[in-house]
């Protein structure tokens, strides 16, 4: 199980507990921190996907914007 899976699992556990009986202050603080971590991981993964994206037109020609190509060259993706 990856770290992201563990974070997601713990968030879900805290959500269920909150629905059933409520959370203590410590648990609420943990939930907020886990949520921040989850969002940061999601954004990083999404940015990585966008950075590695190549856009191709109907004829198969690479029409990726120059700015995206520059980022890809810096990260040695091209």
From Swiss-Prot:
Keyword Zinc-finger recorded: no
The region annotated as signal peptide is none
Provide GO CC annotations from the record: cytoplasm
Keywords, sorted A to Z: Cytoplasm
Which domain of life does the protein's organism represent? Bacteria
What InterPro entries does the annotation carry?
DUF896
Q: Which SUPFAM superfamilies match?
A: YnzC-like (SSF158221)
Query: Which Gene3D superfamilies does the entry mention?
Result: Helix hairpin bin
Q: Does the keyword Cell division apply?
A: no
Entry's localization field: Cytoplasm
Q: What protein family does this chain belong to? A: Belongs to the UPF0291 family.
Name the PANTHER family on file: UPF0291 PROTEIN CBO2609/CLC_2481 (PTHR37300), UPF0291 PROTEIN YNZC (PTHR37300:SF1)
Please give the name of this protein.
UPF0291 protein LBUL_1264
Name the lineage. Answer: Bacteria, Bacillati, Bacillota, Bacilli, Lactobacillales
